[in-house]
Amino acid sequence: MSESELKLVARRIRSFPDFPIPGVLFRDISPLLKDPDSFRASIRLLASHLKSTHSGKIDYIAGLDSRGFLFGPSLAQELGVGCVLIRKQGKLPGPTISASYALEYGKAELEIQKDALEPGQRVVIVDDLLATGGTMFAACDLLHQLRAEVVECVSLVELTSLKGRERLGPIPFFSLLQYD
């Protein structure tokens, strides 16, 4: 991994204390998206990791609603594979399957179209940030329901103190940047 590219990416993540609620330190990726060099570097770094780890044995990238959509298609294009969408409930047409996950005050659901993947296809799930792991875990559940193989989950940022990586169990996880 190129240290200079990683530094370029890290410089474009800013922090906002007490947002959206007191006690939370929000990691904002907006400056990264605004800067084409930093965004390209983030895609190159993620793609480089996946190429070296899976040597071309990835069929699809699955982008998580909504900020995973910002990275999923570009990452898929860099790898020469397709991209499928995992959406919040009620956003996809046609037959879907769903998986629930816990929120701070209730629960939510993710969906994927039933015909999005074939059994045995190898998929990498991407999102902008891993916190508690609830959304990523629900996405893994969806892909397992379709009998696809989740080969890895990746994100730009990982909040290590929230232990989301542990929630994923044996599924490999990679992040470019780690914060407490």
From Swiss-Prot:
Primary enzyme class: transferase
UniProt GO molecular function: adenine binding; adenine phosphoribosyltransferase activity; AMP binding
Major subcellular site: cytoplasm
GO cellular component: cytoplasm
Recorded superkingdom: Eukaryota
Reactions catalysed, as given in the entry: AMP + diphosphate = 5-phospho-alpha-D-ribose 1-diphosphate + adenine
Modified residues (N-acetylserine): S2
Keyword Glycosyltransferase: yes
Pathways per UniProt: Purine metabolism; AMP biosynthesis via salvage pathway; AMP from adenine: step 1/1
Coiled coil: none
Residue list for modification Phosphotyrosine: Y60
Alphabetical list of HAMAP family matching this protein: Aden_phosphoribosyltr
UniProt family annotation: Belongs to the purine/pyrimidine phosphoribosyltransferase family.
Protein name per UniProt: Adenine phosphoribosyltransferase
Species whose genome carries this gene: Mus pahari
Gene: Aprt
